[in-house]
Amino acid sequence: MSSKWFNAIHLLVCPLTVLVGYLMNAYGYGAALQATLNKDGLVNAMLVKKGWFWTSLVGWWCIIRYRAVPGATGRDRRHIVQSFKRYAILTVWWYVFTQGIWFGVGPIMDLVFVYTGGHCHYDVFDDAGHVNEDFQGSVTRTNRALALIHNVLTLHGHHQEHRQQQLWDRSIGSIQGALQATQPKTPKNVTASAAAAINTFIHDQMHRWQGPLTTSAQCRRFGGHWAGGHDPSGHVFLATLMCMFLLGELRVFGRRALAHLYAQKWQLVRLVTRLFDTGPLWTWRRCGGGSMTCGARLWRAIVEPPVTCAAALLRLTRCIACDHPVIILLTLLVTWLWQLLLTAVASRFHTVREHMSGLLAAYIVTGLVYARDAAALRPV
């Protein structure tokens, strides 16, 4: 692939992915994808939220595998040093934008949110006296938040003044009713007239006993809902940053990695096809001849296939991980692009402006880093 085409892909793949998500929503194709989204799912918890770790692990293993090999030249070593500098800059930017600028100082995305009027809400009940559907966005998170709020209010209940005792009783009773109800979104003991007062009381008590909740992490930890200001999309930022890093470093070693993969393509084909040669029916058919007993046939058809399949899978995994980790890198890259598409489709979590601010925040640094090192990124 020519340098110009790779530059175009590197520059446009993330914005085009977001645009495709918007078009899917506009033409009604995004509803099915939105129904499958789960912010508390295993994929989101173990893969997406730890995305920079997985990206760092795979990216650096590829850099080491294809550059720090026996017989590496001085140019290879310079490429590794340059990759480390780029990675360090992107890691610092990821941390200060999403985790925190300094001890006790929130990340940039939270500072933007607070500066634009956002804060940690506790609008637990809506005007109809029901648990607010927009409070946490899912039943699981809502129940977890209600349990946290209930624990804090119960712990500090003896500190209430006499005139607040009635509100405390109402709040505790309403939350208990929501947690214990079969339909937690419609507790019977919350009235419309009391909902606003209860929300205000919960908000004041949580901020009083838990301190100023000025970061999204603190707000989530104590059962609040981050709302009211401009909240740059952390998912868009992270997915874009990871894609830009993987594509940028792939340009350095991609030609060597793909050439190595092409040279050993038939070995990979044999390892893959070996996985399909271990089924019971196939094994039974290979047990032809009259000299084999029925017990031996059953042993070979039932016991041997899973053992043989596991051994073949282990050999394939070892071959990919040790000899061709670029396959893992490309798989991870597709995964992050898919997550970016899902984030663009999930318009209920962020506005278009918030998506764009997350996208631009990632491009500010990655664009400068890879534009500055454009000469050093010539594929080798």
UniProtKB/Swiss-Prot annotation:
The note filed under miscellaneous reads: Present with 538 molecules/cell in log phase SD medium.
Organism encoding this protein: Saccharomyces cerevisiae (strain ATCC 204508 / S288c)
Reading the lineage from the top rank, the first entry is Eukaryota
According to the record, mutating residue 235 to A results in:
Inositol auxotrophy. Impaired ER morphology with the apparition of clumps of ER membrane
Which reactions are catalysed by this chain?
an acyl-CoA + H2O = an acyl-4'-phosphopantetheine + adenosine 3',5'-bisphosphate + 2 H(+); (9Z)-octadecenoyl-CoA + H2O = S-(9Z-octadecenoyl)-4'-phosphopantetheine + adenosine 3',5'-bisphosphate + 2 H(+); (5Z,8Z,11Z,14Z)-eicosatetraenoyl-CoA + H2O = S-(5Z,8Z,11Z,14Z-eicosatetraenoyl)-4'-phosphopantetheine + adenosine 3',5'-bisphosphate + 2 H(+); hexadecanoyl-CoA + H2O = S-hexadecanoyl-4'-phosphopantetheine + adenosine 3',5'-bisphosphate + 2 H(+)
All ranges on the Cytoplasmic side of the membrane:
1-7, 65-88, 255-325, 378-380
Q: Where in the cell is it found?
A: Endoplasmic reticulum membrane
The record, for InterPro entries, names: FIT, SCS3
Q: Does the keyword Hydrolase apply?
A: yes
Gene from which this protein is expressed: SCS3
Name it: Acyl-coenzyme A diphosphatase SCS3
Q: Main location per UniProt?
A: endoplasmic reticulum
Membrane topology note = Multi-pass membrane protein
